[in-house]
Amino acid sequence: MMATLATSPPTSPTWPKRRPRAWALRCERYCCAAATYFPLAFVYSLTTWAVYVEASIGLKPSRSPWIGLPTSILGVLLYICLNASYTVAVFTDPGSPLTTGAGRHQYSALPVSELPEYTAYTVSSTGGSRYCKKCQCPKPDRAHHCSTCKRCVLKMDHHCPWLATCVGLYNYKAFLLFLIYTSLFCWVDFAVSATWIWTEVFNDAPYLETMLPVNVVLLAILGGIIGLVLTGFTAWHISLAVRGMTTIECLEKTRYVSPLRKALDRHRYEHILGNHRDGNRASPVADSFGHRLQDYGQQILDAHANAIPGVTRAEEGEERLSPAPEQPASHGVSDDQLTPAQQALTRSYAELERQREHDRYQDYLNEEDNGKLPHAFDLGWRRNLLHLFGNRPLLWLIPVCTTTGDGWRWEPSRKFLEAQEGLRLKREQDMANQQHYYRDLYSRNMNNGRAWLGPNAAAPTWNPHQPLDSFRDPERPATGVSMRTLAPMSPRPRPGDSDFEDDISETDPLNQQSVPANGAVNQLQKANEASSATTNRREDSSEWRDWD
């Protein structure tokens, strides 16, 4: 049966069946493209109709003193500006990390010991560097992945369906100008059409009875409604531009780097490089190179620790007769800086569970501190607007891209750095207090245990790098699972077992009064031997009774 299935070629639909399916897919693709560009056609047609009606009102004779040629020229100018801004916002690339070469090769599968310089101030939900798995590229600060455009966008604000594209770093200025010009255009149309209706229609009864200008009334209604809604949306985006924020940053919580991360990374970086200030300084380059080679081999071994059980790690069920040798600390690196494979091989389940609880508590503290931090990229309203509109005031009202920056490097605000430094000092003080508490608790427990070890016991030592592992016994053998530890124990006593001892000690002072004579003792011993022989004969036949 399997041979028949293996030899039979895969069936495929014939050409008459595949042709309608391909035609349907092509039609679906065309319909989706037409639906994508429908908002563009709608905006262009609606604004063209509005400017035609508004200019016609100004060119006709009117009783209103301010409706005339100036209002028509103003409407045409706003129409040109808003459509130019709209076109630039639609057809300008908002910017993507994929279009630039920066950071494309920052990730590698090879083990490295050097730590990268963290220039980013935001992290992912897990606290690590932000990386897009769909685009296969690192995400800088303020960059997000758009599921509609199917790519990452630099300084992404939102995906606008009326633009059929994302609003990002390079087209946000044109988008904001489009909102401003459209709001002004709607209010101008509403004012001109409403004034003309009030002065020409309601004051002339015969004219009202004979004809009703439908276009003017419709322009007044649409101009008022769209202008009211769009003005609020424009004011919202102007406030975001003044504060230096995006829509995503305002509506969603931004996760910043932990205040202790840079300090811990710098401390670990010094240890990895072998910064021996008090030790041998003869050949620091050779020593550091040797340490790096040793770290490379150790990382490769840890990555394949589960590939060869029994060689690179202890096999499951294997029991060691002697305690596991302790691994010497490499360049002062604590257990918290070991890889998960190293921690699984050198630490027990209780210690790992304590470490997980500690990590969860640290994540909770990071979330609490994250809510206390101000916006990291708010440089003040003046610098925020200069970043958006550029340094040339003559180009501020023209829809050309004058936004500064490349989308990869962002300058943090002074308030954010001060708040982060204050939180870092507070966290360091809390960690020092916690280490002091564990140090005292460890010393008290060891001093209480020295009475059992004797007067020659060594004094207890404390390792400040492991506050949560202070109760670990370094001489404890490695834990393992074997058939001996998994042997079932019956709650019923075995044959020959008893809760009381069978033999009676003659030297026991509590039983000296009840000890019989020598003859009686000999008879009692013979009876016990006979009972043991009987029990041994029944043991083979009753062994299954020990199992539940």
UniProtKB/Swiss-Prot annotation:
Keywords tagged on the record: Acyltransferase, Lipoprotein, Membrane, Palmitate, Transferase, Transmembrane, Transmembrane helix, Vacuole
GO cellular component terms, semicolon-separated: endoplasmic reticulum; Golgi apparatus; vacuolar membrane
Top-tier EC class: transferase
Domain of life: Eukaryota
GO molecular function: protein-cysteine S-palmitoyltransferase activity
Species name: Aspergillus fumigatus (strain ATCC MYA-4609 / CBS 101355 / FGSC A1100 / Af293)
Pfam families noted in UniProt: DHHC (PF01529)
Reactions accelerated catalytically: L-cysteinyl-[protein] + hexadecanoyl-CoA = S-hexadecanoyl-L-cysteinyl-[protein] + CoA
Protein name: Palmitoyltransferase pfa3
Function according to Swiss-Prot or TrEMBL: Palmitoyltransferase specific for VAC8. Palmitoylates VAC8 at one or more of its N-terminal cysteine residues, which is required for its proper membrane localization.
Ranges annotated as biased composition (Polar residues): 508-535
Domain named DHHC: residues: 130-180
Residue ranges, compositional bias (Basic and acidic residues): 536-548
